[in-house]
């Protein structure tokens, strides 16, 4: 497992926006991770983190509190994929659509008048 100390939360959101890899997210926030799992589910984890952060209001929080909230959200997103696979979680639309119930096609309606 890789881990690093939490970076000083000057503006954690700005730092995360310029992060170039999933590993940087984990290092900036000080979240331990398994490199094997991250190699398989990196995009899924970051997408799920984004979904969770969409419900958060970090703009008016002090830097250390915003960093703590981001860390908690990343840990939660990572835990989702420790417990199950990206196929089970279906974060992306293409995976959701693959199992979406198909709407049955209705037979074409032909009025009796057209059968003359």
UniProtKB/Swiss-Prot annotation:
Biological process according to GO: nitrogen fixation
Signal sequence region: none
Coiled-coil region list: none
InterPro entries per record: NifW
Keywords: Nitrogen fixation
A Pfam cross-reference name: NifW
Keyword 4Fe-4S: no
Protein family per UniProt: Belongs to the NifW family.
Biological role: May protect the nitrogenase Fe-Mo protein from oxidative damage.
Description of how the protein assembles with itself and partners: Homotrimer; associates with NifD.
NCBIfam families for this protein: PRK00810.1 (NF002009)
Name under which the protein is recorded: Nitrogenase-stabilizing/protective protein NifW
């Amino acid at each position: 497992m890789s881990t690093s100390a939490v970076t000083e939360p000057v503006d954690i959101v700005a730092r995360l926006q310029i992060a170039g890899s999933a590993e940087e997210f984990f290092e900036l926030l000080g979240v331990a991770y398994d490199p094997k799992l991250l190699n398989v589910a990196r995009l899924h984890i970051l997408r799920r983190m984004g979904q969770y952060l969409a419900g958060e209001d970090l703009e008016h929080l002090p830097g250390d509190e915003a960093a703590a909230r981001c860390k908690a959200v990343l840990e939660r997103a990572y835990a989702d994929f420790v417990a199950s696979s990206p196929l089970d979680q279906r974060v992306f639309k293409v995976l959701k659509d693959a199992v979406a119930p198909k709407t049955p096609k209705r037979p074409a309606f032909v009025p009796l008048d057209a059968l003359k």
